[in-house]
């Protein structure tokens, strides 16, 4: 009873909250507004709280702890309730752009606006426009590896200079800014990357600090002030293709980290106006005009967070269309070699097995990567029953007790030690399953951020790499105010630097990519509470897969998944309860594998979602039904606006029988009215 629920028993805080809710119901306890879960870390604390609320004594004597192994009960024949089958609402969605006028919603702010420098002169021009509106403005310039943070005056404007990758520098900047009445932050620094390619970057990436890290530090330093305001503005500005990278081929995807941060921060400070703005590159060549365009959008237009502005001024939003792949399945070939990060077990392994099953006897090779080292004895456990595994787990527990100075072992220590064995067994199962399909697999223990290690691996395979599947990732959800800088950095770099390291392996193998896929997340597409880092990393990879496809380098697809049921991160306690409470559908393993196999072998490309209902995450109703397909002859006829001027949308068609259309009449579209 005195063991820490999370640290020693492995019960996460979400599950603890559920337990306390049940306790309140069972003991009919009144609602206690002053109850703090972290003040009750053990069951003894829970018991004392119950007695206090019921009017009993507080002190509770803890019974002696008896260390006993888990016993496998003898099966007893008894009726087993049928499992509740979840309806599969998840499907494939293709991300496209849709014109978005936005709502006429001007805002007027009092205070000072912080603007990060862009390198094109837009930030200063924007500051002058802000001052014309009666506000004040300061600039923050990001310069990598400068020794000291500094501030000076430029034409009566305060300008700070700091290294965005130096948390101490950024803390000093924020300390100075907190002396002011900060009304908002406009992050234009990603525009510096509009004139540079990702290939120009270092490894580890220095560009990512310009787009994400400095922005995160400023938000963290100003978060409390933003929370106290009734209104305010937070925005990021990029220059990909005016459509957040959905069609262009010449842009630097690292810029998208800023968009990911903005989209997620929106869910933390919903009372602020937020905008992740992507400008067509031609628009930023005229600094004055670009500043006016940005100011007009930020101060005059409400609605969606993620907006693209094309060269002709049209506004675009990204939406998702229900769309199935219809091409024939093309199996892998004997000379295909895929390198697969995170491929030993879990979601990625299940997906790769699916591809292998649809490429029977192809002789393709899968190089599976993971951080875990294999435990040789687990190779013999592949066919073991649950009873055999439990027996071995109990013997491991006794080994840990014998090796412990205290003669005890906690549940967390036991499970952590066992995890090494279970993961190793999972890898051997994955390899065996792939080999049974007539393909080959090998496992390599290497950190995806170890660029040199991956280059060595690529050179040692003896086969040119033709495909990358990047499934590795970390997730550590915390609000900006409480998120650790080093955690933010690690979550992003596993995805972003990991991708670059995998490309290094391809190069050293002498291969040319035919196919690439990144496992991303719906949090990258829409943003999500507490996931600024995860969203930033996935936003970059989403855009990069679209860019690779558009450039013809290779066919590439980013699959943004919802949570998977019963595999990978989804096996954490209380996972399903959290998603159910948020109204988010999780995807079954079978459906997820089906979607990925289609992307890999049926021509999937650019950005795809594998999800169902996303609850409040879909804040702006981004999902669309599949567009109606018309016979070619009919489509060409009704496309002529002179013959059919009142056809905006075809709702239904029965060929050669009937056609139902929809039209919106407006003076703007029909001046004759």
Feature-to-residue mapping (PLM):
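4′-phosphopantetheine-dependent carrier domains
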Residues: 1-304, 310-315, 322, 328-673
């Amino acid at each position: 009873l005195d063991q820490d629920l999370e640290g020693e028993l492995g019960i996460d805080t979400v599950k603890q909250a559920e337990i306390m809710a049940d306790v309140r119901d069972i003991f009919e306890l009144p609602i206690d507004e002053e109850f703090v879960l972290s003040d009750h870390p053990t069951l003894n604390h829970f018991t004392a709280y119950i007695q206090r609320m019921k009017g009993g004594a507080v002190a509770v004597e803890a019974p002696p702890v008896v260390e006993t192994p888990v016993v496998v009960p003898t099966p007893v024949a008894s009726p087993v309730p049928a499992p509740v089958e979840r309806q599969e609402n998840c499907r494939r969605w293709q991300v496209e752009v849709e014109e978005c006028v936005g709502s006429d919603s001007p805002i007027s702010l009092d205070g000072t606006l912080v603007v990060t420098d862009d390198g094109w002169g837009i930030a200063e021009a924007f500051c002058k426009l802000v001052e014309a509106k009666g506000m004040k403005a300061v600039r923050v310039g990001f310069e990598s590896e400068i020794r000291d943070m500094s501030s000076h005056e430029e034409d009566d404007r305060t300008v700070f200079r700091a290294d965005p990758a130096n948390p101490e520098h950024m803390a000093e900047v924020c300390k100075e800014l907190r002396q002011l009445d900060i009304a908002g932050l406009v992050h234009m620094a990603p525009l510096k990357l509009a004139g540079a390619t990702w290939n120009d970057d270092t490894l580890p990436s220095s560009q990512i600090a310009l787009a994400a890290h400095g922005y995160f530090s400023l938000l963290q330093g100003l978060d409390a002030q933003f929370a106290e305001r009734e209104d305010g503005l937070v925005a990021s500005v990029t220059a990909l293709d005016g459509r957040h990278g959905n069609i262009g081929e010449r842009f630097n995807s690292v810029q998208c980290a800023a968009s990911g941060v903005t989209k997620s921060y929106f869910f933390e400070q919903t009372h602020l106006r937020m905008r992740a703005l992507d400008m067509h590159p031609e628009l930023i060549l005229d600094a004055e005009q670009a500043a006016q365009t940005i100011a007009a959008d930020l101060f005059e237009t409400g609605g969606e967070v993620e907006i693209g502005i094309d060269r002709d001024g049209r506004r675009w939003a990204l939406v998702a269309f229900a769309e199935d792949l219809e091409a024939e399945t093309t199996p892998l070939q004997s000379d295909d070699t895929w390198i697969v990060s995170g491929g030993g077990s879990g979601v990625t392994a299940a997906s790769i097995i699916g591809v292998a099953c649809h490429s029977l006897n192809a002789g393709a090779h899968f190089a599976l990567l993971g951080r875990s080292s294999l435990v040789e004895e687990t190779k013999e456990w592949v066919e073991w029953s649950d009873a055999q595994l439990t027996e071995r787990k109990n013997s491991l527990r006794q080994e840990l007790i014998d090796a412990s100075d205290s003669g005890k072992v906690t549940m967390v220590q036991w499970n952590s030690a066992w995890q090494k064995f279970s993961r190793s067994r999972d890898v051997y199962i994955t390899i065996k399953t792939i080999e049974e399909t007539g393909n080959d697999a090998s496992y390599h223990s290497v950190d995806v951020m170890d660029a040199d290690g991956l280059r060595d691996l690529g050179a040692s395979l003896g086969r040119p790499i033709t495909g990358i599947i990047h499934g590795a990732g970390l997730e550590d959800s915390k609000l900006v105010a409480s998120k650790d800088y080093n955690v933010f950095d690690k979550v992003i770099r596993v995805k972003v630097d990991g991708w670059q390291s995998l490309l290094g392996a391809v190069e050293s193998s002498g291969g040319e990519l035919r196919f690439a896929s990144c496992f991303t997340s719906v949090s990258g597409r829409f943003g999500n509470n507490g996931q600024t880092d995860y969203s930033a990393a996935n936003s970059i990879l989403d855009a990069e897969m679209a860019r690779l496809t558009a450039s013809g380098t290779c066919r590439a697809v980013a699959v943004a998944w919802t949570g998977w049921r019963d595999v990978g991160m989804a096996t954490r306690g209380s996972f399903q309860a959290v998603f159910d409470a948020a109204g988010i559908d999780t995807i079954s393993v079978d459906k997820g594998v089906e979607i990925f196999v289609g992307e890999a072998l049926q021509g999937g490309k650019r950005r795809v979602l594998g999800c169902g209902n996303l609850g409040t995450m879909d804040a702006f109703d981004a999902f669309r039904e599949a567009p109606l397909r018309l016979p070619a002859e009919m489509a060409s006829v009704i496309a002529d606006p002179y013959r059919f001027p009142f056809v905006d949308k075809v709702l239904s068609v029965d060929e050669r029988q009937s056609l139902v259309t929809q039209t919106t009449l407006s003076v703007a579209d029909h001046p004759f009215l």
